UniProtKB/Swiss-Prot annotation:
Tagged with keyword Transmembrane helix: no
Phenotype reported upon loss of the gene: Shows increased sensitivity to the N-glycosylation inhibitor tunicamycin and leads to a significant attenuation of the virulence on tomato plants. Accumulates significantly less fungal biomass in infected plants and leads to significant decrease in secretion of PG1, the major endopolygalacturonase produced during the infection of tomato plants.
One example of a Gene Ontology biological process annotation: protein folding in endoplasmic reticulum
Single GO cellular component term: endoplasmic reticulum lumen
Low complexity bias spans: 509-521
Record protein name field: Tetratricopeptide repeat and J domain-containing co-chaperone DNJ1
Taxonomic source organism: Fusarium oxysporum f. sp. lycopersici (strain 4287 / CBS 123668 / FGSC 9935 / NRRL 34936) (Fusarium vascular wilt of tomato)
Gene from which the chain derives: DNJ1
Amino acid sequence: MHLNLAGLAVAATAFLATASALSPQDIPADLPVSNLLTKAQTHLSRGETNEALVYYDAAIARDPTNYLSLFKRATAYLSLGRTSQATEDFNKVLSLKPGFEGAHLQLARLRAKAGDWDAAKAQYGLAGKAPKSAEFVELEEAKLAAHLADMASKGGKWEECVSHAGTAIVVASRSPHLRELRAHCRFELGDVELALSDLQHVLHMKPGDTSPHIVISATSFYALGDLENGIGQVKKCLQSDPDSKICKKLHKQEKKVEKAYKKIQGQLSRGQPTTAGRALVGTADDSGLVPDVRKQVEELKKNKSIPKTARIQLLENLIEMTCQAYTESSHKEAAKYCDESLQLNPDSFWGLLHKGKAQLKSELYDAAIATLEKAAEIRPDQKEKVNPILNKAHIALKRSKTKDYYKVLGVENDADERQIKSAYRKQSKIFHPDKAAKQGIPKEEAEKKMASINEAYEVLSDPELRARFDRGDDPNSQERPNPFQGQGNPFGGGHPFMFQQGGGGGGPNIKFQFGGQPFGF
């Protein structure tokens, strides 16, 4: 039998915390009100606000006319963010003690936080604050900033809107209107995550409103590509309102997309690009995930559930996945999706890889190298896919500055033996000196061209020589190092051999010269 000690410890702690929580039944009925207030103050000093509230409740129940007890309970409510209950207590204080400045001051601050400028101004006046006091000045500045933010939004001046709204929110931190206004302007600027942060504040201020849930969920899921948090937010919407049709619809839609997305990811990781491509783009019988998401995003933007200017990261991911699937399966429409992937995201790895290949094929070697190096930098974990193509580009660039035997014969780099032989015969028929004259090709030009054709065929028809050429080593290059020079001379001394072969009827005349002394054979 195995015991989960960690689990037991957590359970025990939770049990003890519950058991030790103070309840009204724990307070002796005969404890004097003064003692109750002392106990409440002691708990407050320890940061135990909930326990303090239990004692304040008991004290007020026994003496509901004590305005100071109500005032202290109101401040305790404030510290917990329970503003509606605090406001109620402050109003009770004023009904018992009209003109109590402390209550007016607290109500002024509460109205200011809510962005209720006129009510806050009135309460500051009742609290005895002069028109030139710091509180009045701050309030007027915040009120003006809120007005300027509204005007900037209407004029499409998004940065000004965000700046002015921020100034107002310093004072009116619990104003739903200002938070929603700044969220809107931030969305227009493309600051999606900051805008969502503002909407999270709105949720706390308007707990019964499902609209922020929908915007946060849809924007997180589609615009940010954060599937987990997007679904998590719409679940909170259903917890807030289990009967919400719009929340149910969005939850079902997002779950379906997430399931298909993960399935396609698995297909690509298992090397099934053709299957993945069909799932992404669709077939005659089934719509694909890409068109489905396009349609969903269009509808969500129309309903203002996603900001109209937001980038759609989920769609960018899907387009790049399609580029990958079509590239790996050599699909004829790979260029279409890879080009779109780069338009949506200039740092698309698969888009860059496809572009680099296309540039290499078009003999844009410098551009291909730059593109492929960028791809390798973006995804260091994918270097095994980039490096072989990058090496080809470097070799092709080097070859382009010397001889290109493939180009001489007019064949592709991956041509097989049959294609090479066929190209050789075709070129020979055109440029053979005996036949070139009939086609108007000068004899000297034909001989020169035929020599190049023979040289190219000699290399490409020999697997070993061709392999060397493909690695960037031209077998006919005059720049290759002499194995008998320098340190490579097996006899030392740094003196080269001289090899001469003479013609003539007397047979070869071969001489080797070593160290300045000839040896004749």
